[in-house]
From Swiss-Prot:
InterPro entries: SmpB (IPR023620), SsrA-bd_prot (IPR000037), SsrA-bd_prot_CS (IPR020081)
Protein name per UniProt: SsrA-binding protein
Function: Required for rescue of stalled ribosomes mediated by trans-translation. Binds to transfer-messenger RNA (tmRNA), required for stable association of tmRNA with ribosomes. tmRNA and SmpB together mimic tRNA shape, replacing the anticodon stem-loop with SmpB. tmRNA is encoded by the ssrA gene; the 2 termini fold to resemble tRNA(Ala) and it encodes a 'tag peptide', a short internal open reading frame. During trans-translation Ala-aminoacylated tmRNA acts like a tRNA, entering the A-site of stalled ribosomes, displacing the stalled mRNA.
Gene3D superfamilies the UniProt entry points to: 2.40.280.10
Places the protein is found: Cytoplasm
Pfam families: SmpB
GO-annotated cellular components: cytosol
Keyword ATP-binding found: no
Top-rank taxon: Bacteria
Keywords recorded for this protein, A-Z: Cytoplasm, RNA-binding
Amino acid sequence: MGKGGGKKSAAARAAANRLLADNRLARHQYEILETLETGIELLGTEVKSVRAGQANLRDGFCLIRRGELHLHNVHISPHTHASRYFNHDPLRVRRLLAHRREIDKLRGHLEQKGLTLIPLNLHLQGSWIKVTIGLGKGRKLHDKRAAAKDKQVKKETRDAIARY
């Protein structure tokens, strides 16, 4: 008889699809028009650091260079148990893995003024680390205030309905 052919428990499924890092500020500063889930090319020590939750997406952005999607300014801390020789540069440019048609579609959108690609989160999908990137349009201060006001009104409405 084979081993492990049964169903996974709920805890095992949750661990296999775990959020590793989230860029909450991006949803405040940008209006997200479209999202795309991509793979990411990491070194061994980077994988260990990301799984330990040592990644910061706050200043990150994506560029398309030579037909490839690259992730810039994402800080992944050096692994604590690796020697200095084997460790990675925390701010190195990392390649994102997406299909050609997806990259071409994003390139077409980026030619419009004011749009940018930003990393929204890093998460596990099975044993693979994935990056969700978003096509965003920068918000002005009055847009941020309006969005916060709408959010507050929705919350108050939801709370009022829950009370009665």
